Amino acid sequence: MNLVPTVIEQTNRGERAYDIYSRLLKDRIILLGSGIDDNVSNSIVAQLLFLEAEDPDKDISLYINSPGGSITAGMAIYDTMNFIKPNVSTICIGMAASMGAFLLTAGEKGKRFALPNSEIMIHQPLGGTQGQATDIEIHAKRIIDIKRRMNEIMAEKTGQPIEVIERDTERDNFMTADQSVEYGLIDKILERK
């Protein structure tokens, strides 16, 4: 059972109850706190678009604690982050792995953060298929193209040469917050708000 906390806010018109995510959204904070699938992606994209409509000149904060997930769902979030006018600041809390790490690094340069005990993990895309040999070949080519594109984006965002990204994403590559700053995945470790 997934319990969502409720907060009570006093206004001049009385009390108002919000689920915690709606209250955070009021402060332009979005939480990605799960694996990334189509439903999660659609929710994050909708929140980004809503906040842009509310104020296109004010930053949005995306807090990430995610093991990763679907590439296409994650790319929908990535593309929306780049499509909208507001800068999207990313903050790793806990773990940003796989597509979670990709989205963390996709935040606005200079506004990509992690808390001190956060862990970031990068690797190559995972996938699998079955069927006729020709279909398997089609899917294999597709995942190789996705890997190349994601490595190019990661190289651009981190400042690392593409060869370094290719080598370092060959297997699961775990980094501390400090190592992530050195690598260019994030810009700074946040100690206090």
From Swiss-Prot:
Keywords: Cytoplasm, Hydrolase, Protease, Serine protease. The active site is at S98, H123. This is ATP-dependent Clp protease proteolytic subunit. It is found in: Cytoplasm. One of its GO terms (biological process) is protein quality control for misfolded or incompletely synthesized proteins. Belongs to the peptidase S14 family. SUPFAM superfamilies: ClpP/crotonase (SSF52096). Cleaves peptides in various proteins in a process that requires ATP hydrolysis. Has a chymotrypsin-like activity. Plays a major role in the degradation of misfolded proteins. ClpXP is involved in the complete degradation of the Site-2 clipped anti-sigma-W factor RsiW. This results in the release of SigW and the transcription activation of the genes under the control of the sigma-W factor. It holds the Pfam family CLP_protease. NCBIfam families: clpP (TIGR00493), PRK00277.1 (NF001368), PRK12553.1 (NF009205). It comes from Oceanobacillus iheyensis (strain DSM 14371 / CIP 107618 / JCM 11309 / KCTC 3954 / HTE831). Its main location: cytoplasm. GO terms for molecular function: ATP-dependent peptidase activity; ATPase binding; serine-type endopeptidase activity. The keyword Manganese does not apply. It is an enzyme of class 3 (hydrolase). Fourteen ClpP subunits assemble into 2 heptameric rings which stack back to back to give a disk-like structure with a central cavity, resembling the structure of eukaryotic proteasomes. The keyword Cytoplasm applies. Its EC number is 3.4.21.92. GO terms for cellular component: cytoplasm; endopeptidase Clp complex. Gene3D superfamilies: 2-enoyl-CoA Hydratase, Chain A, domain 1. InterPro entries: ClpP, ClpP/crotonase-like_dom_sf, ClpP/TepA, ClpP_His_AS, ClpP_Ser_AS. It catalyses: Hydrolysis of proteins to small peptides in the presence of ATP and magnesium. alpha-casein is the usual test substrate. In the absence of ATP, only oligopeptides shorter than five residues are hydrolyzed (such as succinyl-Leu-Tyr-|-NHMec, and Leu-Tyr-Leu-|-Tyr-Trp, in which cleavage of the -Tyr-|-Leu- and -Tyr-|-Trp bonds also occurs).
